[in-house]
Amino acid sequence: MSQSRARKVLIVGAGPVGALTALSLHRRGWEVEVWETRDDPRGQDAAPSNLRSINLAISSRGLEALRSVDPSIAENFLEEAIPMKGRMIHHTDGKQESQLYDPIGGQSINSISRPILNQRLVQSLPEAVKLRFNTKLKHIDFKNRVAYASHKQETSLLPGEESEKDKKQNTEDEDGTAFDLVIGCDGSWSKVRTAMMRAERIDFSQSFIPHAYIELHMPSDPASPGGYAMDKNHLHIWPRHAFMLIGLPNKDGSFTLTLFIPFSSLELLDTRESAAAFFREHFPSAVDIVGEKVLLDDFEKNPRGNLVTINCTPSAWSSHAILLGDASHSMVPFYGQGLNCGLEDVRVLSSILERHHISPTTTLALGETDPELELALKAYSDERQGDLKAICELALQNYTEMRSHVLSPLHHLRRQVDKVFTTLFRSAPQATLSLMEPFPTKKVRGWTSLYEMVTFRPDVGYSEALRKERWQKDVVGYAGWIGGVVGVGAAGVFAATMAKKWLERR
């Protein structure tokens, strides 16, 4: 009889998703090894190591994923995060308009810096988890279940970037690392995904939007309360139709600003003078707060980032490989769900492993195919795919809403309709999450805004949120047709009453 041993998992990528995956599987009893291209973040200053990462907004889905592994981690993060109760719209005339995310329940999303989040998650990993930094995946021999890496003395590059000097300094791990399962948490340009596509027929798509993003900085203001020059409990948006500026608060009183602008418009801002005129025309209030020199210095020196949507299916191969986070489903950042969805992947995978009774130990030889684990990974890929496609679609839709629709009277009308209908036909409270069932609410009853379902209802899958919203849009259209309304008014309430039987069925 073969001797029992712990299953060996190799996780490629020690970002937030990779680190949480490592902690989750370690606590299940797996032998865990993690490879990361970049330097060890532990003990470093948590100031951003690069300026290509948009501030993160962590909300209920991400927090529930953290709690599913270790409740104390989620609570610790909330102490370092800043709650944002809504959007603060900055109009060109200087007026500001607050749009609450949850006018009835008062729930908030939370601003946190990516370096802090990542550092704290890596710090939470116990010594039993083998961490190898400055280690870059070179290739995977899936036939023999062995991964090979190269090592660098130090690196400050992003994944996917490598200078000629770095290439010469790399040394390959000739022995390689054997595994039962390799998990790709290595981002949009995943090398694990590339290796899987050589071993399995995988449908893959990527599409870029025509906008670049540039990170800017609003320093703290010593003369303002807490150092905040703007209300710290809002996500600030300067929507200008073709482009927009957003601002998320930091603990030190500063704001991380991000400009989203078409590449075609960006090409016209090729001098400091043209950039200054652009900011003065479209974002005068931001210029007044930040200062023109600081804003232009950041604009000139900071890199231009691309925004891409990536989908691949299946996201698992045999019992030996699976993709999580951006490696499987990179999305544009306009719904604030990239991080939350990636962390939720970990919770869903853990739930499916539990449902399939996957033991942390096995009597199979290292690297031998496990039919039961293969079924579990396939179940994850099949069940998760609809939700991943839905949130990528919703993120693209919100791309238009944030920069343009928030200025539309119809957007305000729809918000009022949602508020009235939610009061009249309140949906059932959030269902208790179960280890065996990641999304216990299979069908949302009553009326709930799309934003609430996506952001504050981790018991509801993204695909169900999208289905419900499409139906609610049909009801709103019906209400408008019945009443010819331009406000909620009596006709809207009448139509709501007419729709009551529908709502109870749906």
UniProtKB/Swiss-Prot annotation:
Composition skew (Basic and acidic residues), residue ranges: 162-171
Record function comment: Catalyzes the hydroxylation of L-kynurenine (L-Kyn) to form 3-hydroxy-L-kynurenine (L-3OHKyn). Required for synthesis of quinolinic acid.
Protein's UniProt name: Kynurenine 3-monooxygenase
Biological processes annotated in GO: 'de novo' NAD biosynthetic process from L-tryptophan; anthranilate metabolic process; kynurenine metabolic process; L-tryptophan catabolic process; quinolinate biosynthetic process
Pfam families noted in UniProt: FAD_binding_3 (PF01494)
InterPro entries: FAD-bd, FAD/NAD-bd_sf, Kynurenine_monooxygenase
Top-rank taxon, per record: Eukaryota
Any GO CC annotation of this UniProt entry: mitochondrial outer membrane
Gene label: BNA4
EC number: 1.14.13.9
Needed co-factor(s): FAD
Gene3D superfamilies on file: FAD/NAD(P)-binding domain
Gene Ontology MF terms: FAD binding; kynurenine 3-monooxygenase activity; NAD(P)H oxidase H2O2-forming activity
